[in-house]
Amino acid sequence: MKSNNLLLKKLSKHKPLVCLTANNTFIAKILDNFCDIILVGDSLGMVVYGEKTTQKVSIDMMINHGIAVRRGIKKSLLVVDMPRGTYEKSSSLALKNAKKIKKLTKCDALKLEGGSKISKTIKILVRNKIPVMSHIGLQPQKISNYKKYKVLGRLIKEEKKIINDLKSVEQAGSFSVVLESVTENLANKVNKISKIPVIGIGASNKCDGQILVTEDLLGLLNKSPKFAKNYENLKSKIAKAVKKYSRDVIKRNFPSKNYTYT
């Protein structure tokens, strides 16, 4: 691994970083056995609350879910997203909200979407002993319609911007960076020049680690992006279980004597 940052010393330097999202204690306990980093992502706005984008997620939502996930983690690094509107307007607002999230959730770090435009804010957070994971490439908080999500890096101007963003967040003090929805060629370039761990999501296997939304991995959603492999189809399995339960209740087969007090 390319960083000697204290936060990453407990992580393996010889294998890619395994990262997933969690939004409740139960899932966090399971992930903690396998993940280096667990993210309480603002994707919970979509996968928990049914929103079409992440833009309506509030700081209170992130704090409540962060507290729940913290209860389930013993060894993984816990990172919490700063939601849209909590850090972009000013560094002072960002610091105030970052301190609040970190204090209440007891997370190890915060994740901020953006590159050069928020480098000053990143510096201030880091100076105040708030570790920052950056997020460059596709930035969902800036997109009002998920249908507008696209792959970046095919145009020279996109490549230049992303590389510039990388250098900016590095210099500002971020300990790692999420790189989302870029071409394999650009991901390879970013990974080679980066001095901090690059965690990919839709950014090929060239990165130092990978992150997915856990609900995508488990096959719980109606539709997943191309880069998200469904390792299981829990949606179908849950439907089958509920169908069996419904049938047993209607036929008065449940609860049977095995599930009844005497």
Question: Which residues does each PLM region occupy?
Answer:
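Alpha/beta enzyme core
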Residues: 1-232, 236-262
